C-alpha cells in the first residue's frame, strides 16, 4: 500500500532525463541493479519517499495484426503474436484508425511493469533487432486477393524472454533450434540465421563476468538446445 501510494510513473526517458533524487535501490527489468542510468526510451517508475527506481528496457516490435476492442479506440493490440495492453489514451491514439494507425502498422512498444505498453515508437525510429532460438514454424493456406497462397509463420523465443511470431517467405526454411536474428524496420519484419560465436569461462560469484569478460548490467542470457528447448537465465 505504501509503495502504490508513492509510486510515480510510468515515464519514458529522454536523452536528458534527470531524476529528482538519488536512488538508493534500483531494479532493472525486475532485478536488482547497481546502475541508475537511464537511456532514451527506457520506461521508468520511482518512489521518492522510498528512494527506489524501477527501469524497464523490454520492447515489443513488429507489425500490428489485431486491435481490440475496436480499430478507432483500441485498448490492446497484437504485435508479433502477443497481445499487449495499451497503458494510456495517448498511446492508443497513435495506433487508432482515426489517426491512420492500426492493423498493418509497424511499431515498437516500450513495455513497463507487467508488460503494459507505456510508450510507442512509430515511423523511422521503429527499428529493433532481437536474438533468439526458433521454437517452431508453420505454413498455412490463406486467401490472398481471391487466390490461395501459403503463409509461413516462425515462432522465436528471444533473449528478453518474449516469444515472437514473424511471417516470413514461404520458400525459406527455419528448423527448430536455429539461432536467429529478428529484425523489425519501418518496412516490416525479417528473420535470418546468425553465425555461431562463442566465449568460454567460469561465471564469477557475483555473476558480473564470464571468465575475463565483464557482463553488461542488463545482459540477456538464453539457455538453448539443438531441439529448440530454451529458457532465459538472466
Spans of features found by a protein language model:
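...the same signal can extend to comparable exposed beta-sheet modules
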Residues: 1-234
